């Protein structure tokens, strides 16, 4: 089978190795290369012969999108694919307004959704992760549905870590891992729910700078049921997944919720935002919450800690549907279907 040559570009400045978009890019590279393809992650230092690529995937949205598109459209062979990140949490109508009118290419007023809208017809096709993203691209940008391919995102955990789970040994706490200071992760309401409903909460992840550190300690100091364990290595993270009875992701802004997928295959009950795309991945087997409602968050976590939930059915479902082998073959199939002759 002929190898496909692919370049993946992230169109924004990035300083976080563990950011969701860059993690997705590395997973795609690894998975597609295991199928025999050639994948380059583009940076500013390498030498790239653009006309040797079959595809250039623009992964995500950002301020560098226009620069890349204006430069790359001069190369004739590669097809350019958009794999956008649509985690918009307000109304569809406001998304349409924002994407069409909030920004100006002529005046160099760059806004990610406006820039994506401006470039919408420059892409050969789109790769989306959910029906939620598909609707925004099809209806918001007026893109033919035949040019939109929905591909599930795979979890990144190697199968060797996914031993059988002893649910009887699960510990009675709720776990959360994220960029804790990001407003979209809604950590403050999660903490307030733990304080009000007195359940054990373990927080992990990054906090940026002294201001965020002070903010976190103001919220949790003096509350012995809440613990911050810092940034975790992968092995440490997997250990907390395997021990926790519940994982909570009550985000206001969330694209897929990779950490919730990961936690589910370690046997956690999942508390999940009812906003946006993440709920599509769980087939009705997550406890959905209104992320603005502390009581809803707290009561659903307490219920899940009592053992009311969807495991082990959820674990089996995610292992079957979101493993790397299945998802990468789906992506490879789409690329081969649309491949042009050299």
Model-derived regions: residue spans:
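Conserved acidic donor-binding segment of nucleotide-sugar-dependent glycosyltransferases
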Residues: 286-294, 302-308
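Nucleotide-activated donor-binding/catalytic signature segment of Leloir-type glycosyltransferases, i.e.
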Residues: 214-235
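Membrane-proximal helix-turn-helix segments that form the acceptor-binding/catalytic region
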Residues: 104-126
